[in-house]
């Protein structure tokens, strides 16, 4: 009988973008929803904070919010951005850089959608704050390639052994971070109620270039 030897191997992913996923602490979810409610439920404030003219979405409301009104949230976004770069390029282009944010809330209802688009920044992110009560049942009913209300990231050209898309089913608290140039879209849904998400861009300018880093 041939001698059994333990196979040792590594699998590398040298090409294509990475997507970071984590869970938003409940304290942030509550504070972000409270600030979103304050603006969304007031027609005057909704108009003052309207951000839809800068966005691709076909949705009920998209309103800008001030991240500094959420204690420690800017620091949380920076921490996640640092972790993303630590994993992808093993360097920290944010340290010592000038960092800016643009944060907004997307309030969607049945039939709303967001077509394929990219963002103008360094990193972008999405966090889910609310989903309709009947969303899970609607998703489960779609027995073939369920996508109702889902976020989809689109990468390379379809090919053997190369995944070209990733579909993220919304769950309250899920937080995604990705390169701003990564194409993504949001599918419509039919359930009654609000699908609410937080979207943001992180911009930074390096005072001193880092060798091998192009961001």
PLM features: what roles do these ranges have?
Residues 101-177, 187, 194, 204, ...:
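Catalytic core of non-heme Fe(II) oxygenases with the double-stranded beta-helix
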